[in-house]
Amino acid sequence: MLTKPKVAVVLLNYNGQHWLQQFLQGVLATDYPSLEVIVADNSSTDDSIVWMREHHPQVRIIQLEQNAGYAGGYNLALKEVEGTYYVLLNTDVQVEPGWLQPLITCMESNPTIGAAQPRIRAYHNRSLFEYAGAAGGWIDILGYPFARGRVFDCIEADTGQYNDNVEIFWASGACLCIRSDAFARAKGFDANFFAHQEEIDLCWRLQLLGYRIMAAGASEVYHVGGGTLPVGGRKVMLNFRNNLIMLSRNLPISERLWVIPVRWILDVIAAWRALLQGRGQEFIGIARAHFAVIGWWIAGKHRHIEGKKPLHRLMGVHRGLLIWDFYARGLKTFTEIISNGK
């Protein structure tokens, strides 16, 4: 009988004792023979560590000295983790015993597969996909992310339409399976992101290194969503800032020269629309994001990316304009957009 590859499931925790109490036991019940479950704690101020040591002393805990966010926290924690595969799992994700094997089977099917995700359904409405990744992430030519099963805030019911194994652009950070050597080769997440869209940036860089990103349709998990960082101006700021930084760094200059100005204009429109509709925190968040990007450029914090390719040559890229397809043409689902998008 062949030995199963070692898998380390790493949960990054920040003041998530209530999530650990609710979901950690399910992770420990995973049906996989070569598994280590690790909790990396991002300097929590609640009783997460005390509770784990009392109720789950067998779980290895990696204590980080400060809250380094999702990106920096995982970068630090994974330096202390061994395994063929890492599975980065949010603490607010519920799993069933058989969730992991389909992910590993997908990864093992081809050595060029660098990362994969399961189908992610909503914990509170289980017939629907969940916002953060749904059945696998795509991106359009302006850098707007969407997913099979979720376009902007329009979320589909899971009727089995995305149960296949298929290449995508990005795998969700809510449940991300990645080869440990691929993570190291890509030099991990960009810690400057802190949180939000760091997994899209990483998957983009993995594709530039020649890896494929997959959705493993036979694997299914349930995600509460928004379990760590509350909705507000900071969340908006991080999303807008990180998206612009990702585009600035990963696009070849021939595309960067027109994509960034167009996105800048569209972001300004989005900011004023939010303000006129009474969403002042969103307006402030977008404004702060743009000032932060200017500071990022001036400070020279960007990392040089080798082997840049035109975005449309990568997998999981919609060559049309998502905002036009969605708002002007009325295409609300992934299938409609990919089938009819221009």
Predicted regions, residues:
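A short, conserved alpha-helix in the catalytic core of glycosyltransferases
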Residues: 163-220
